[in-house]
């Protein structure tokens, strides 16, 4: 079907003028509104004003201009339906064959820190979605464009074939409904947050494609990376890649895990992650010292790992990193000398990210077959006001440092989780075992002689005193755990028996 008449009304005017000029050269009549009409006329394009079509002025500060039978009748009339065509002829309605509309910038408006509620409401588009939906419903007869990126493909098809194919119209219609659904979801989310609704009867979210991925967790799985419509400061989706191969699905998950851990620390810290579990964490007076400790924590598992640091990478740290095979290094920045060292490895991925950014109170979404689980992110850190010491002995100064490190790290280890820390570094990590004492044995075995004098962190309480027994045999001198078991007293007695200082936090950190 030849395009004879187009309705154009856009907020994003990117590449609009040359596109419309070419349409008019092909004999297309253009109807337009407001600022779009003004722009086109200023650039020498003949335009029919929307009021000339509706016979009604634009009113209410532009809130009401396209909601009219002369517009929607021209969009919805099925060309092959004799009754439809007779009705629009009877009422003097002319068919519209092409709709080019994009919407008021609601997302950009609410992204502003100083946005008012009134500003947000005024940027909710009404007429635009109405036209887009009407045209998309009737896509067998109407071509609809919501994205400036589609100007050239549509124009080329019109030039080459004289019309737009049904397949292309379907693709464009599907894109429109995705776009309007995302637009409405963002509005719904904004208003839901304004009124403070915690558990709405429908949960609507919108994500935007960031990049295609080669494959998913395994080569036979397809995958894509999407990011939240509103950027989350300090999130892995906001990281900038400076160097190296394209990120993989597993890279992104591991990098996210590393960022979440290193964010727990204010002092210089380095985190090494493999398969979303930390294999080495260290802190120090400098970032080089912190990385040296993270490396010493587990020299084997760090191979092929992901490193996150919370200070600029300097030359000394870069040289230490360069000596190891790593997949990714994430840091707030890299000195030029560090980049000169690290970019010598062409495949090493270097990412910059403000890992110190305050974590926003996002919801954590976990898919299950046929459903979605939603919970608050576990943002609870070490809080002196919540701790209690049930044992006879209290931790000494160094034990306190190691207990805090173990507690910050164990929160991010797959349950059941046990972490041993000593001298400002992890020395053993026991992850993902079906019983707690099993995880403790793994952490102790990994630590070896370093278990002596170490501090043990547990993500949940001890149902029996066997973990304390294993820790004592290995030389652990301090333990931090939530407490709360009906058999806490058994573990306390066992700790007192061996002179172990035990701290209760009152907070559990399961991670499934």
UniProtKB/Swiss-Prot annotation:
Domain characteristics, as noted in the entry: The IMP cyclohydrolase activity resides in the N-terminal region.
Catalysis performed (reactions): (6R)-10-formyltetrahydrofolate + 5-amino-1-(5-phospho-beta-D-ribosyl)imidazole-4-carboxamide = 5-formamido-1-(5-phospho-D-ribosyl)imidazole-4-carboxamide + (6S)-5,6,7,8-tetrahydrofolate; IMP + H2O = 5-formamido-1-(5-phospho-D-ribosyl)imidazole-4-carboxamide
NCBIfam families to which the protein is assigned, alphabetical: PRK00881.1, purH
Example of a GO cellular component annotation carried by this entry: cytosol
One term of GO molecular function: phosphoribosylaminoimidazolecarboxamide formyltransferase activity
Family (UniProt): Belongs to the PurH family.
SUPFAM superfamilies referenced in this protein's UniProt entry, alphabetically: Cytidine deaminase-like (SSF53927), Methylglyoxal synthase-like (SSF52335)
HAMAP family given in the database record: PurH
EC number(s) recorded for this UniProt protein: 2.1.2.3, 3.5.4.10
GO biological process, one term: 'de novo' IMP biosynthetic process
All copies of domain MGS-like, residue ranges: 1-146
InterPro entries, A to Z: AICAR_Tfase_dup_dom_sf, Cytidine_deaminase-like, MGS-like_dom, MGS-like_dom_sf, PurH-like
Full protein name: Bifunctional purine biosynthesis protein PurH
Entry keyword set: Hydrolase, Multifunctional enzyme, Purine biosynthesis, Transferase
Keyword 4Fe-4S listed: no
Native organism: Bacillus subtilis (strain 168)
One Pfam family here: MGS
Pathway as given in its UniProt record: Purine metabolism; IMP biosynthesis via de novo pathway; 5-formamido-1-(5-phospho-D-ribosyl)imidazole-4-carboxamide from 5-amino-1-(5-phospho-D-ribosyl)imidazole-4-carboxamide (10-formyl THF route): step 1/1; Purine metabolism; IMP biosynthesis via de novo pathway; IMP from 5-formamido-1-(5-phospho-D-ribosyl)imidazole-4-carboxamide: step 1/1
């Amino acid at each position: 079907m030849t395009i004879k008449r187009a309705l154009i009304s856009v907020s994003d005017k990117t590449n609009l003028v040359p596109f419309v000029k070419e349409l008019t050269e092909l004999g297309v009549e253009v109807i337009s509104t407001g600022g779009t009409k003004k722009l086109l006329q200023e650039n020498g394009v003949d335009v029919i004003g929307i009021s000339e079509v509706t016979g009604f002025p634009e009113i209410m500060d532009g809130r009401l201009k396209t909601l009219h039978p002369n517009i929607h009748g021209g969009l919805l009339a099925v060309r092959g339906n004799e009754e439809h065509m007779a009705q629009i002829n009877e009422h003097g309605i002319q068919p519209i064959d092409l709709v080019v509309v994009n919407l008021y910038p609601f997302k950009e408006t609410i992204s502003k820190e100083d946005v008012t509620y009134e500003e947000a409401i005024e940027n909710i588009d009404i007429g635009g979605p109405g036209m887009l939906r009407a045209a998309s419903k009737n896509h067998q007869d109407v071509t609809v464009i919501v994205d400036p990126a589609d100007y050239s493909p549509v124009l080329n098809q019109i030039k080459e074939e004289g019309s737009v194919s049904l397949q292309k119209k379907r693709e464009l219609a599907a894109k429109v409904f995705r776009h309007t659904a995302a637009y409405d979801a963002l509005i719904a989310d904004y208003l839901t947050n304004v009124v403070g609704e915690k558990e709405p009867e429908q949960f609507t979210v919108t994500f935007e494609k960031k990049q295609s991925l080669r494959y998913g967790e395994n080569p036979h799985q397809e995958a894509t990376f999407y990011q939240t419509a509103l950027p989350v400061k300090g999130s892995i989706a906001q990281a900038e890649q400076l160097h190296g191969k394209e990120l993989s699905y597993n890279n992104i998950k591991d990098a996210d895990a590393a960022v979440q851990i290193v964010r727990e620390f204010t002092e210089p810290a380095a985190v090494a992650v493999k398969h979303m579990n930390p294999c080495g964490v260290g802190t120090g007076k400098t970032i080089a010292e912190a990385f040296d400790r993270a490396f010493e924590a587990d020299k084997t598992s760090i191979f092929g790992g992901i490193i996150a640091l919370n200070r600029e990478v300097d030359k000394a740290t870069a040289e230490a990193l360069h000596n190891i095979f790593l997949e990714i290094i994430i840091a707030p920045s890299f000195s030029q000398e560090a980049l000169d060292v690290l970019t010598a490895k062409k495949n090493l991925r270097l990412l910059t990210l403000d890992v110190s950014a305050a974590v926003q109170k996002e919801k954590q979404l976990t898919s299950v077959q046929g459903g979605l689980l939603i919970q608050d992110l576990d943002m609870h850190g070490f809080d002196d006001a919540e701790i209690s010491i049930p044992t006879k002995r209290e931790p000494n100064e160094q034990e306190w440092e190691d207990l805090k490190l173990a507690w910050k790290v164990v929160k991010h280890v797959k349950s059941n989780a046990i972490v041993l820390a000593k001298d400002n570094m992890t020395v053993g990590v026991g992850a993902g075992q079906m019983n707690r004492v099993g995880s403790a044995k793994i952490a102790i075995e990994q630590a070896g002689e370093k278990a002596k004098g170490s501090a043990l962190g547990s993500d949940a309480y001890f149902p029996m005193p066997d973990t304390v027994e294993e820790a004592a045999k290995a030389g652990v001198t301090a333990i931090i755990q939530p407490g709360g078991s009906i058999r806490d007293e058994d573990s306390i007695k066992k700790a007192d028996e061996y002179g172990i200082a035990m701290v209760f936090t009152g907070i559990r950190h399961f991670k499934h």
